[in-house]
């Protein structure tokens, strides 16, 4: 007596197809780094070799590109959130971007523009502040805001003191 086995079902997608579909679904929301996608695949229990094959294919067709991601991330976070070089580097590192790619993405930023962005952020906040004789509270809040965005203590203090004096002069006129 011979036992026959039915042919493998073609309606059930393979693990590789499922992993590819997951990656494509994640990429429709926003671009992601290779490390982020690998982490999501591992979190959902896909074997590492399946994840590597899927990610290699997505990289080959240009859907996953850490250099493009880093450049876009730096441009977006710099313009919208006012982040400093240090904060941007930390964010990219947390997303699994390689140090060389981070360095390349941040190479176009200069210190003068960073200080200018800090001044702009402080000016915007100061317009809404009610200034009193005691500047300590306002100064503390503004320095903390810049620190949260990754600016150094020195730059934050210098910018806040200068902009606070300029705002006081502006309001006197």
From Swiss-Prot:
Subcellular location, record wording: Cytoplasm
Superkingdom assignment: Bacteria
Pfam families assigned to the protein according to its UniProt record, in alphabetical order: RecX_HTH1 (PF21982), RecX_HTH2 (PF02631)
Record's keyword terms, sorted: Cytoplasm
GO terms classed as biological process: regulation of DNA repair
Chief localization: cytoplasm
InterPro entries tied to this protein: RecX_HTH_1st, RecX_HTH_2nd, Regulatory_RecX, WH-like_DNA-bd_sf
One GO cellular component, as annotated: cytoplasm
SS bond partners: none
Task of the protein: Modulates RecA activity.
Family to which the UniProt record says this protein belongs: Belongs to the RecX family.
Name used for this protein in its record: Regulatory protein RecX
Protein species of origin: Mycobacterium marinum (strain ATCC BAA-535 / M)
């Amino acid at each position: 007596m011979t036992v026959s086995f039915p042919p493998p079902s073609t309606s059930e997608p393979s693990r590789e197809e499922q992993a590819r579909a997951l990656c494509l679904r994640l990429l429709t929301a926003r671009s992601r780094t290779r490390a982020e996608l690998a982490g999501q695949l591992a979190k959902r229990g896909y074997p590492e070799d399946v994840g590597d094959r899927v990610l290699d294919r997505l990289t080959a067709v240009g859907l996953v590109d850490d250099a493009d991601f880093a450049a876009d991330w730096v441009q977006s976070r710099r313009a919208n959130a006012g982040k400093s070089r240090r904060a941007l580097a930390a964010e990219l590192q947390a997303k699994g971007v390689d140090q060389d790619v981070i360095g390349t993405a941040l190479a176009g930023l200069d210190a003068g523009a960073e200080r200018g962005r800090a001044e702009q952020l402080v000016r915007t906040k100061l317009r809404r502040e009610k200034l009193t004789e005691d500047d300590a509270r306002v100064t503390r809040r503004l320095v903390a805001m810049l620190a949260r965005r990754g600016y150094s203590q020195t730059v934050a203090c210098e910018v806040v003191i200068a902009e606070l004096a300029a705002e006081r002069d502006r309001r006197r006129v």
